[in-house]
Amino acid sequence: DGISASKVLADGYGQCNTKGTLFMALLRACNIPCRVHGFTIDKSLQKGAMTGFVYRNAPKNIFHSWIEINFENQWYELEAFILDKTYIKKLQERNPECKGAFCGYGVAVKDFRNLIIEFDRNNTYIQSEGINQDFGVYDCPDELLKEHHQEISAFKAFAYRHIGRHLMNRNVRKIRER
């Protein structure tokens, strides 16, 4: 989660917290006021995106965040930017029987067929139904991470950063390309 915006951009991928850091840097470069909202989510919503030993060893409560922007004097909660439309479309194609709530593959929503993922002066969500603890809003990711971070051993953090996140991103890429 402590990966810089420039590293996320250079890597070409990230997860919710690192993409949020990049998004905030871009928003601020455009003089759009923003803040980060921290949470934990239940790991069950990651099943499918995380598989095998990565899923088995993931903590039950996974640190998560979304970005809030102040646009035209109103705050909006933006979460759906963390998953691309191609990936979401592939998930919908793989789960044609799902007409209501969906939880898995990095998604936890009330209405899987009618997602609100495009910003048009509205909130956008993609994992909000998996939230199990709310940490509130912070002006910058560093402030949030000083108070709250992923509860995980040093060994597991190292393994996730150097192996797990790459396996998870590879799995997401496979789903997207099917």
How would you label these PLM feature ranges?
Residues 1-58, 62:
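Active-site neighborhood of thiol-dependent amide/isopeptide-bond enzymes
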Residues 41-178:
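His-Asp-centered catalytic microenvironments across diverse enzyme cores
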